[in-house]
Amino acid sequence: MSKCDNNCTSDNPLEQVRLLYTELAQHPEKEFGWAKGKENARTLGYDEEWLNRLSDIVWESAAAVGNPFSLGPIQAGETVIDIGCGAGADACIAAMLVGKKGKVFGIDCTSAMVAKASENANASGFPQAVFQEAEMTELPLPDGTADAVISNGAINLAEDKDAVLEEVFRVLRPGGRLQIADMVRHPSIENDACCSGEESWADCVSGTLESDTFLSMLSKAGFVDVELAGYTGYRTATNTTGALFKAIKPG
């Protein structure tokens, strides 16, 4: 469980997510009970060029559960959407890859994270990355905006995951790619005692699904070539692990 202090409580899972990740944005030096920062990203296979190009401030609030960039190349000139972008580490990497002629939209429900992501992108020299506060279920972007949608440890935090995937499908262009890292639940391990409260929802525990369930939801949303690409070993509880998923919008 997180080490978020006692004022980080709420009866609503979404509000609990906002409170916890505001705390992470404002106090990244605190111990939250799960791995974060540059060394965690290195463990997950992030390229050394990216790790060195971005300052420690960009990485300090990054709680990556996997490496979505390992699932396929992001090309120069493309448009990428990062849902649940947090402090913007992945969005900054995407901005590196798409270059000045590309575009990156970072979406997060936490105003403190959006502000920090904007500061990080500006300080890193990525004007092509812009950030907006919004819910994953109501992305403020037109149909067919993106060549790729990435996400890292965020979709499990949504209560209505079907609605999230429908929105992702909507904003992708035909042939667009979904490349995500997220937390999943091991079906063979019983739930931890901590897994029933909203705090563990914000800690990427209670909202997790089994991999097969999530794959079925991707197919239901209309995606093809749906694939569980592997597990990352990231843990938020004894019965969860990071996983990598990819899929294509047909067309």
List each language-model region with its residue ranges.
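Conserved SAM/SAH-binding beta-strand->alpha-helix loop
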Residues: T110-A112
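A short glycine-rich, Lys/Arg-flanked "PGG" loop and its adjoining helix->strand segment in the class I
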Residues: D162-R177
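Short alpha-helix
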Residues: S206-A221
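N-terminal auxiliary segments of SAM/dcSAM-dependent transferases
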Residues: M1-L44
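Conserved alpha-helix/loop element of class I SAM-dependent methyltransferases that forms part
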Residues: W34-T79, I93, L97
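Conserved SAM-binding strand-loop segment of SAM-dependent methyltransferases
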Residues: S124-E138
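Short, glycine-/aromatic-enriched active-site segment of Class I SAM-dependent methyltransferases
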Residues: H186-V205
